[in-house]
Amino acid sequence: MSMHKEADKVSTPRYKPYKGPAGGWGALISVAHFWLTSDNALKNIRTMLKTNQNGGFDCPGCAWGDSPESGMVKFCENGAKAVNWEATKRRVDASFFARYSVSSLLEQSDYWLEYQGRLTEPMVYDAQTDRYKPIAWDDAFALIAKHLNNLPNPNMAEFYTSGRASNEAAYLYQLFVRAYGTNNFPDCSNMCHEASGVALSQSVGVGKGTVTFEDFEHADAIFVLGQNPGTNHPRMLEPLREAVKRGAQVVCVNPLKERGLERFQHPQHPLEMLSNGSEPTNTAYFRPALGGDMAMLRGMAKFLLQWEREAQANNEASVFDHTFLNEHTNGVLEYLAAIDDTSWEFIVEQSGLPLSDIELAARMYAKGKNVIMCWAMGITQHRHSVPTIQEVSNLMLLRGNIGRPGAGLCPVRGHSNVQGDRTMGINERPPAFFLDALEKRFQFKVPRENGHNVVEAIHAMLEGRAKVFIGLGGNFAQATPDSPRTFEALSNCDLTVQISTKLNRSHLAHGKEALILPCFGRTDIDIQAEGPQAVTVEDSFSMVHASNGQLKPLSPQMRSEPSILAGIANATLGKQPVDWLWLVADYSRIRDLIADTIPSFQNFNEKIKNPGGFYLGNAAGSRRWNTPSARANFKANILPSDLVHESIRGTGIVPDLIMQSMRSHDQYNTTIYGLDDRYRGVKGQRDVMFVNEADIIRLGFVPGQKVDIVSIWGDAIERRVKGFTLLPFDIPAGQAAAYYPEVNPLVPLESVGDGSSTPTSKFVAIKLERHAETARII
């Protein structure tokens, strides 16, 4: 069956709670399905065996690190989906765009759009016909250069980056944009782990995690906060279950009961598969209120302080690591005072947990000599995410759990090189040392004022302060909040440019003029003037390794991201401050520039020859604190007085529910591989909302009924999505969950994290209204 037919075929929607483990036969059947429907099955089987292997390519999925152990299979179910999605033979070429107008494509689902295949030639939008038509590469570059050079101010252009971009592409991009004259780098990290970078930079002096892959083998306790690895980082399940087997505590903190955090059946263990066995992936599971994590962590710290005082009074062993505190930290007394000022009653109320649960979590933490704290979007997409992550750091500092084997901080990143892009300088608020290095090496005046993040870029386009948008990968229109306003912002631009592998909605939410520039993916062989090229990526553990494509590109018109960026830069700036076209003839020349300007990349070209790549190092992981005081900082933040934003409270409307957005299992970011969500029991549908059955009844509905969801915010904008099916689910009362990007229209552009500007997609106040169509599926 072709992918085109597969996308047109929609199974009958149904809902049946899933009772099996994560992984197992379900994962194998899913992988087989995506192989067989890729239109390239035989080649893709061989290609998959090169995933995350030396001499192969880096998985285009998540940023989880590679096991140092060798093996033929180093990919997961969702990695297989990502590879088969990219490595299809199906093409979206000039004939496709001749058949479909942009208006007709807008009526299709995101799933249908992406399953049409790979973009194979550069296209320009023709407003008269409402269609894209072919354009020569040089003409496309000239059009971009004309718009950029005609802007009154370089800050009127926005340069977006997806975490798919390689280190080489990201470095070239930031160099071009800064030579052009702006720091406007709205980046996908602004919408996910921005709070982690901000919080950790202030607390421990580095905006990355401090652990390595090997640390998981030595941890006595692993906490997993606001994360669903079974879907988003499936290869993480193996170290979690191995930790449980060796007697470590694995403590999961998530309002939803996620199957990957309960049990895992390893698809590579034949005996386990044949016996249909599985192993637990946790020793405790706590389910706080949405946004209640900081209160839970503060409660754990309050128990530690109580036990420390009891130990001192009884002349017993200390609970705190006083040697570490004295030698490495600042602000502990102020933090302990903040703990004393926080009442147990307020902690229990805001966390949504009984005091006994908080005490148990604290005892599990205190019992572990070496503790790792992991977290993801459930922590980072709240208004108070920066203080919450600093509370994680505070808790770890009390017992010296940073900078020793088996212990540390682990923000688990999403896209495969989102961390590397930031290392390369994709940052709207770049550090001075990096700008100094660029000026010294390239001899041009680097812009010093902060640029725009994602939310600021949308506001600038809405208000006419930005007129050109260039997207290096991703699906900006669908990944962002307040979707109708984002679409309006893009349509306000004089020019939008999308550098993409596959068709998505961002090509349809376009400016007055628009370009689609088809680029290579991670699986494609990249041959430039000096021969075959490798690119590099950085994972969540600061490991950098090479990636070599394995498949011949579908069209000679497709180009690599570095080649496209060099073409744009050459047309816009000429050979200033570098010869762009000479650089991309051999990517080792780009890596030499990286080595000249970014710490820890000395001898870059030699280091990537090492099997498995090389470790960048981590100052905080070595107990070197890059803070003004050269110490790690306790942050005595107060808990939010109210989790509900004043703009919601000011309406006088009492929310029916607080909703979080999330992915399905057949999804990676905005890429929809299918319409099923196996672990949650959903088949053939995405317009659903998971709600506690008691809440469904309390609100006057019945399970399976369709509703409209209306967001509450203190402005005159109606934010509504229609026809969502209510599914009864094991979720705490008062909470709800639904898939993005479908519910992104409900997230106000103004509702962002303090200090991070990340949209608060995990805390959306909503009302439910009856939908005109009352058909039920259960």
Residue spans for each PLM region:
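Long, low-complexity intrinsically disordered regions
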Residues: G753-I778
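Short cysteine-rich clusters marking metal-coordination/redox-active sites
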Residues: G56-C62
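Short Cys/His-rich Zn2+-coordinating modules
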Residues: L36-R46
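Cofactor-pocket helix-loop regions in the catalytic cores of large enzyme subunits
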Residues: S2-L28, G117-R413, L438-S622, A630, ...
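Short, solvent-exposed secondary-structure boundary/capping segments
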Residues: D730-V743
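Long, low-complexity segments enriched in small/aliphatic residues
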Residues: L583-R678
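Low-complexity, highly charged intrinsically disordered N-terminal segments
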Residues: A82-R131, F141
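Glycine-rich loop/turn
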Residues: Q108, W112-A127, D341, Q660-V688
